[in-house]
Amino acid sequence: MVSKGVTLIVTAILTLGAIPIRAQHDSESERLGKLERAVEKLQNRNAELEDEVSSLKKRLASVPEYDANGNQKPKSESDGKALLEKPIPTEEKPPVFVVQRGPEIKLTLGGFIQANFEDGDVSAFEGRFGMTALKDRFRLRRARINLTGEFAEQFDFKVEGDFENSDGTNSNRTAFSATDIFVNWHRYPEAQIKVGQWKAPFGLEQTTPDTQLLSIERSLPTGAITPERQIGIQLWGKPFTNFWPEQKDLLTYYFGVFNGNGRNTTLNDNNNFMTVGRLELMPFKGQIFGQDASLKLGGDVLNSRDEKATNISQSLNLLVNADGSLSPYVLPGADERTAWSADAWLNIGPFDLIGEYLAEDVDGRTVAGVPPGFSNFDPSGYYIQASYFILPKKLQGVVKWEALEPDQVDDDNIHSLILGLNYYIHGDAIKLMANYVHTWSRFRETHPGFGNDNFDEVILRLQLMF
């Protein structure tokens, strides 16, 4: 009996002892599995690091080293067994570094070149015929370089110059001069403040960037009536940016105060300033016929009191000459002028339709008993432009009709029809453009003694942005 009891007790003890041993064995197997997986991951990562180190060594091997005196050190070559120093004759030149001097968080260097070939009645659509006619030519239309930047303190800036502006001593010679130079405080998208020199906010076509125009040149009414670049200050913004983010582009406003004498001038002609305002409304942005579509409307107003000898057509021509041609309008006496415009831009997929009407009242002022020396006149003009991508994002056809009435003599209207093709090699960055322009002079038609009243021109352009 005792022996049987002892046997039962020993059997029970052994059975109970086997349970933790088996559990312990299972636990060790799991741990070993985890360790194996971890080791495998480390091996894979180690292989990746070896590849990266090998790649970096290859890059460093191609970079020249310099000593404390700026002389290039000899390169080291390895035969796989020993490291041999073999001096390689190279030009001793210290490295060059370009870094920003200030605390900017963003700095961008860019620019663009536009080269033209102009044949036929060159620039006749701008009123340059008869006594102001131009000859066939190759022309560097624009060659600009710009620097833009941004600060963490909510300021951005732009400095741009053009190598193809008149140098001021000879209208046929060009030199480098400033186009855009401004600082913009953008802390609040609804109310930004801009100070410096840039295009006054007047006219859709005038404020469209040069590189994004669908015709090679802007229309005559745009050049005759809009104020172009000015020096001053501007308040502008998009009121719905934070209040209604989905419709942030619904409304954009601009209000600026400028000297009114054009760009790169140090003096104001009097103690008055040009005031300019513009509103842009985008009432629709969505899809039509399955295509992205939008409708943009705009309106502008301008007022300025100018003194004698001020050029009021700073972009193109407005003064009607004796033979019906045009030239810049330099005031023979003081004036007060008010201009306004309205524009619309409809886009439906590959199709764009743009129209703009511009008008101006130029009224003479008597100053210190001196009459203005000219009669009041009210120039006006418009253009309508349609374009369509024949090949999506590559080949675009353009048709444009424009007209200007200077309103200085009877029948002084000038009309032009432009037919164009644009080939986008790499978007706007590399673009080829071709325009055929036919121009009618109503003044020449009613006064045939002055010569031809119909003019034809072909313009070709290569554009490259960098």
Feature locations, PLM:
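Bacterial N-terminal signal peptides
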Residues: 7-17
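N-terminal periplasmic/intermembrane-space "pro-region" immediately following the signal or transit peptide
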Residues: 21-114, 121-126, 245, 250, ...
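N-terminal secretory signal peptides that target proteins for export/translocation
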Residues: 1-4
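Acidic-residue sensor for enzyme active/binding pockets
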Residues: 28, 36, 50-52, 160, ...
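Outer-membrane beta-barrel pore domains
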Residues: 132, 169-171, 181-186, 192, ...
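A short catalytic or substrate-binding loop motif that flags glycine-/basic-rich loops and adjacent residues
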Residues: 90, 226-227, 335-336
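Outer membrane beta-barrel
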Residues: 94-291, 296, 301-303, 377-398, ...
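A general secondary-structure boundary signal
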Residues: 32-36, 42-47, 52-61, 112-114, ...
